[in-house]
Amino acid sequence: MHVISLSLSSIFFFLFLTSTILISPVQPTTSKPPAPRPHRELSADYYSKKCPQLETLVGSVTSQRFKEVPISAPATIRLFFHDCFVEGCDGSILIETKKGSKKLAEREAYENKELREEGFDSIIKAKALVESHCPSLVSCSDILAIAARDFIHLAGGPYYQVKKGRWDGKRSTAKNVPPNIPRSNSTVDQLIKLFASKGLTVEELVVLSGSHTIGFAHCKNFLGRLYDYKGTKRPDPSLDQRLLKELRMSCPFSGGSSGVVLPLDATTPFVFDNGYFTGLGTNMGLLGSDQALFLDPRTKPIALEMARDKQKFLKAFGDAMDKMGSIGVKRGKRHGEIRTDCRVFL
């Protein structure tokens, strides 16, 4: 999300008005990206001899970034999700398009235009520090996985062991992004199909959506819900009327809101908790794809359970992140590489 041209005063104004309350506009998935490979290919102690201080090094960067640039947390978590869902968890999202090249890298895709620089910067800084201690040994994809976990934990979420041993991918193509990233108006059918193509269950779909507890969205991603829901020229009937009025104040129908972002969980936007799910229970979901989880009989019971039991959600989220982190893992020189600069192939 390329944001916060939103002022602090307008954030607090929005939070004051809404006592209750990772995103792009739908397109079903057609490709068949790699499903998770067995965890035997990854291990928590993969670098125990090669770079035993790895997690301490990455942690020193993430803790500093969290204090100085808190938006780095949701930005990096979203970056990890977008990486894993396209080519697998291989750091391909970090590649920059070569100057003058017509072959655009993943990060140039429309669906990735709102990925914030704070997320990329966090990984670049962590990689530079790791390289100074363990040159050419640690993949960018492993650093991204560790950093995402760190930010989740720093924000109040679960601490889980990150299995490591990923190699960085050798390709990054913008055209592969659209069918593999959920949209802000995706239907539950589309979401279930997409997540299933990655080897993830309906429960894991709902649980991983809980990362929106510290997420933000641009007005354009939910403007249709406010003014012209599915071409009716009316707002989404599932939207709480108080919230509708407040959102229209922040996001006018035309002009003046291109840089405005609003929290997906306005009660605790920088705390990783189950507030996202309690918001859905009172029709305070900002995105149509979020609120849909509370309207569909396949997903509503899971969302209700997560809203009722914070600890159960946190445990389930850590487990789901662990599983997601094994999607499309690359191993060995035939399939991958260990980049020294996360932005360019070797």
UniProtKB/Swiss-Prot annotation:
Pfam families: peroxidase
GO function terms (MF aspect): heme binding; lactoperoxidase activity; metal ion binding
Subcellular location(s) of the protein: Secreted
Domain of life: Eukaryota
Assigned EC number: 1.11.1.7
Leader sequence residues: 1-31
Amino-acid positions noted as binding Ca(2+) 2 in the UniProt annotation, renumbered to this chain: 213, 265, 268, 273
Catalytic activity from the UniProt record: 2 a phenolic donor + H2O2 = 2 a phenolic radical donor + 2 H2O
Record-level GO BP terms: hydrogen peroxide catabolic process; response to oxidative stress
Glycosylation site positions: 185
Record-stated family: Belongs to the peroxidase family. Classical plant (class III) peroxidase subfamily.
Note: There are 73 peroxidase genes in A.thaliana.
Designated name of the protein: Peroxidase 19
Taxonomic lineage from the root: Eukaryota, Viridiplantae, Streptophyta, Embryophyta, Tracheophyta
